[in-house]
Amino acid sequence: MRLPAGKYFVADPCYIIRDEKYDRLLEETNYFGYTLPDRGCIFIDSVTKLPFAVFSTAYGDGCYRDGFGFKYGVDAGCISCVPVAMVDEHTSSSEYINLVSFDEPFEVGYNDGMITFGHIEIQTKGDYDEYQEDYQEELDA
């Protein structure tokens, strides 16, 4: 599965998409395809006609890191790669929103807990207690 080149927000979609649009996308995508074998996929926004990707994490909510050390706080059980042009105004100035530029079309996917958006790889499966400890530290901060 591939998305076109461009600027994207990589984050839990509930941090970057406003309430009404978020509710519409949940309905249109059957809750971001949480029951699909690949735990998500590429969807097309019915309003902007832009493609975006969403994949469920292995353990649901928590705090997950990519290979570069960026932390992704997750409260909706998934991580997305959403074109900046699709987002009117994100809901939060959260430190968990990663703005990434992709110079050419890139692969997205999920494999045994690893969510991949081009060069961004986010491991969501492993030591569950470690993820929960990171998440609790973030909540307490």
Q: Could you say what each language-model-derived stretch is?
A:
Residues 1-141:
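Intrinsically disordered, low-complexity acidic regions enriched in Pro/Ser/Thr
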